[in-house]
Structure formats: C-alpha cells, structure tokens
C-alpha cells in the first residue's frame, strides 16, 4: 500500500512514519524542506497540479490536524481549512479512496471528567488556534465525505506519549497504540465519514474506546482498536 503522510515536520507524525515505514511504502510531505531518510516531497498543498502530482498513485493519505505552533494563528487555520480542502480535492481527482485524518481528543476535554464521552458527543473546541484547527479540519473532512467524494476515517487521538514513559494525562496515547489505530483505520470498512476516539489503557483513563460509530442513521462496526495492556494501569 502506498501512503502519503502530511506534516512530516511534526514530531508525532514522524514517530508514526518511522514505524509505518516498515509496513507500507510511504511518501512524506511538508511545506518545509527536510531530510527524512524516506521519500519526501515538499508541498504547500496549493490548489494546483503540484498537489495532484503529490497524491497521484497513492492508495491512502494520512493527514494530520496538528498545526505548527511556530506559525501565526491565521497561517495555522488556513492550513487546516484551505490546504485540507485542496488535498482532499486532489485526492478525489486522483481517485485516492481513503483518508485518515488525525484529530485530537482535546476537542472533548471541556466536558466534565465524570461523563462517559463517546464519538457521538458534539466537540466543544476551545478558542485557541490549536483546538480550532482540529475542529475546522474535521469540518472540511466531514463535508467532503458527506458528498461521497472520499471515504474518511477520523481518529481523535489522546496525548501522544513515548512507549515506556509514564502517562502524561488520563487521555495519554502511547505510540504503539497510535500505530495500531492507524493501521486499523487504513483497512477499516469505512462508511464515508467515521470517527473514533483513541487513547491508551492508563490509570483513570478518560475516554471510552472500541465503540461502534453511527453514520447516516446506521450503526457501523467498531474500528477494532484495543489498547495494549500496560503494567502501570
């Protein structure tokens, strides 16, 4: 399977890419030129033939909603709205049928911790650029999927934590669990627009995982993700 991964300069994306590189043929991209040791194509994800050439021949795209904090807020939001739209449009034109959008559980953390928050709950993003970027990126993806242009699986990830480290929060997500979720999303029998909450098994874990997703009034199967047992849990 040939997979394009965006935002290669983001450490979380590179952590995933290093592991996925042994399973798939990866092409990485970012607006900043960089050396990765893997196939890399610099791209601004503009509305032109360059983005079509970038996605041409890919079987799937893993697109990150994480915004570079060194960019201005307007640049961060522009990337998640305009550039995400450009990427999905090119994917549709080039007949890429699968996109995995990496979002965040941060959109859900305004709910009280004693609530059993699932994927059916409405996101409540904060007013900061990082939270709004995830929210607006999801919005663009959802509208594309609703028009049946591309099948999109949205993974709301917990706080990325290196394997073997102490959990950073009650919604921590270890890298190996994140890899498992992404691999499942790449082969999941997507309905068009599917959302799944992903976190690891940690003490007092906050979010439910492994839930089925309700799309167009019908209950679909779960992603099949199960967090790995942790000795510290």
Positions of PLM-derived features:
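Catalytic helix-loop patch of NAD(P)-dependent Rossmann-fold dehydrogenases
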Residues: 112-152
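Flexible, glycine-rich beta-alpha linker
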Residues: 107, 129, 147-169
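Conserved Rossmann-fold NAD(P)-dependent oxidoreductase catalytic core, especially the SDR/UDP-sugar
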Residues: 86-127
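Conserved C-terminal active-site "lid" loop/helix of NAD(P)H-dependent oxidoreductases
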Residues: 195-232
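Alpha-helical substrate-binding/gating segment
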Residues: 146, 157-162, 172-196, 201
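N-terminal Rossmann NAD(P)H-binding glycine-rich loop of SDR-like oxidoreductase domains
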Residues: 1-22
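NAD(P)H-binding glycine-rich loop region in Rossmannoid oxidoreductase-like domains
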Residues: 35, 42-81
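Glycine-rich NAD(P)-binding loop of the Rossmann-fold in SDR/ketoreductase-type enzymes
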Residues: 46, 75-86, 94, 128, ...
